[in-house]
Amino acid sequence: MYKRQTLYQKTDKDVSVLAVNTLGVLYLVENGDSVKSVEDLKGKTIYASGKGATPEYALNSVLKANGIDPEKDVTVEFKSEHAEVVSALVQDQTAVGLLPQPFVTTALMKNDKLKVALDLNKLWEDSMDDGSKLVTGVVIANNEFVQDHADKVNDFMDAYKESVDFVNSDTEAAAQIIGDHDIIAKEVAQKAIPDCSIVFIEGDEMKTMLSGYLATLDDQNPEIIGGQLPDDAFYYTR
């Protein structure tokens, strides 16, 4: 998600974020039953993919917020693909894996020994005191287009919200559509949708959760958000 903020800087602030469309989809999965709280991660090996991206920075933020040093108290080993994380978990029953939805659901359906130990998204919300949330995706638009076609943009946003409401209220029908279009199997989609954090959040609420999230990333590495935090013009309001 932080790439949108980088785009904001690279385009000389020619884009705005209309809404948050996906919150956190990251979960800590284990092959066992030893992790009940974030404190139980101390001394563990955590397998993950996404080095230099949201998974790494989100994990580090949650660990640090709970008094765990990512470099000293845990061993984080990055893999190139999610499937490699699952393979590592199968071989190392003392380890934990950081995986996103819907891959979590796929992995659990294929291996009944795996289980979700912790919800990184909830850990983020419990650990941060700035009203931020773990943001995975946003809707952006070119500012010139927004200014020239404000009515169309607002119609699009209304339709987008209706689509989100439909997916979350009728997961079976939504999963059927997803399966019919060969995105992922219907069975996987139906189980995964409730944990995919599909949302439509705009206005002040969007600004609060997104600005806090970007500030947390900025504390770790300003370069990943383009070197500086965005100004208020980055957040579209209608």
Regions found by a protein language model. Name each.
Residues K3, E77, E81-I177:
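Pocket-lining segment of extracytoplasmic ligand-binding domains
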Residues P70-V74, D182-P194, I225-D231:
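Short, surface-exposed acidic
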Residues V146-Q220:
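Secondary-structure end/capping motifs
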Residues S211-R238:
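Conserved C-terminal helix/tail region of periplasmic/extracytoplasmic solute-binding proteins
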